[in-house]
Amino acid sequence: MYLKEIFVDNFRNLKKQKLEFCEGVNLIYGLNAQGKSNLLEAIRLLSMGRSFRGSKMSELVKFDEEYFYVRGLVRSADFYEKKIEFGYKVNGNKVIKVNGNKLKSTGEILGHFLTVIFSPEDIEIIKEGPSRRRKYLDACISVIDKNYFFDLLQYNKTLSNRNSLLKKIKEEGKGEDLLEIFDEKLAEYGARIIKVRNNYLEKLKNSMSKFLMEISNEKLEIIYLNSAGVKEVHEENLIREKLKNRLTKSLTLDLKYLSTQVGPHREDFKILINGYDSRVYSSQGQKRTAALCLKLSELEILEEETGEKPVLLLDDVMSELDDNRKKYILKKLEGFQSFITHTSKSDVEGDCCFKIYDGIVMRE
């Protein structure tokens, strides 16, 4: 899979322009604050339907403008081409199209254009709390499993309804008879979510272990702290039963905090390096290496599951790596289309080079 061209209009500081890209390494270089990351953000938007920086849609619109529009032409391994369009107005109207067909929701964009983003912020997945890891895990799985994405949406909707009911029970003293219905649904969706998460984390563990051993000769383990508290995570019926029981037992605590304290929305997974929790005990260098292995594993799993080579976006990553790791990652990226941002041309050899200045991208 590769991105043949992109057209941007009123996106961040980027000037209105159409760009054509190489199938190999596309080096985008220039001084800081000229728009390098903004270009990668526009590309990633066509893949995931949201900013990889966590920005609101309104923040992507150029200053003093009313809208932004991004269009990309993507070719898959079978040479089938897709035109993906994303338009947004500051009044909140959003239109996403694939080959001219309007999508009903942003989530429907997932899977049409596969990308993996590498950035210095990847270390946050290792360093920060459970919600950061859950968010990352859910995004990775949702791209390759539409059923998981649906279950996640339904679970979160049911969770919100249950939390509203808890407030009603606390304030009005009625509605407790409805909890059984919500608990059944949460257990049903939750069991499937837990099973799929476990399967993905098994693949992630195997892949990360391989990469970490190659890079630094260290051992890695992943421990999934599933909310059902079961060891046999492959038995969906058992997971559902255990999760339902835990929801029932946590009612007193739920009413105290007016929120559901048990379920996939509270889960976490630990990444252990040489037997120690990397979040707590690993050095900054070990955490950064673990984050690199995590993203390489995401890439490997995505390719295995889809049969497509994702497009790789490396946002100011090279400056964070020593020479050995830099050579290692460049070797792993061979055969993929990649977009690498850097402040100069000296460190990375690109098949195509683009200089960016004040939002204008010029091919050299």
Swiss-Prot record:
Species this protein is from: Caldanaerobacter subterraneus subsp. tengcongensis (strain DSM 15242 / JCM 11007 / NBRC 100824 / MB4) (Thermoanaerobacter tengcongensis)
GO BP field: DNA replication; DNA synthesis involved in DNA repair; double-strand break repair; SOS response
Protein name according to UniProt: DNA replication and repair protein RecF
Phylogenetic placement of the source organism: Bacteria, Bacillati, Bacillota, Clostridia, Thermoanaerobacterales
Record Pfam families: SMC_N
Keywords: ATP-binding, Cytoplasm, DNA damage, DNA repair, DNA replication, DNA-binding, Nucleotide-binding, SOS response
Keyword DNA-binding applies: yes
UniProt subcellular location: Cytoplasm
Function, in words: The RecF protein is involved in DNA metabolism; it is required for DNA replication and normal SOS inducibility. RecF binds preferentially to single-stranded, linear DNA. It also seems to bind ATP.
Database matches in InterPro entries: DNA-binding_RecF, DNA-binding_RecF_CS, P-loop_NTPase, RecF/RecN/SMC_N, RecF_2
Residues annotated for ATP binding in this entry: 30-37
Family classification: Belongs to the RecF family.
A GO term for molecular function: single-stranded DNA binding
TM spans (from-to): none
Broad class of where this protein is predominantly found: cytoplasm
Organism superkingdom: Bacteria
A GO CC term assigned to this protein in UniProt: cytoplasm
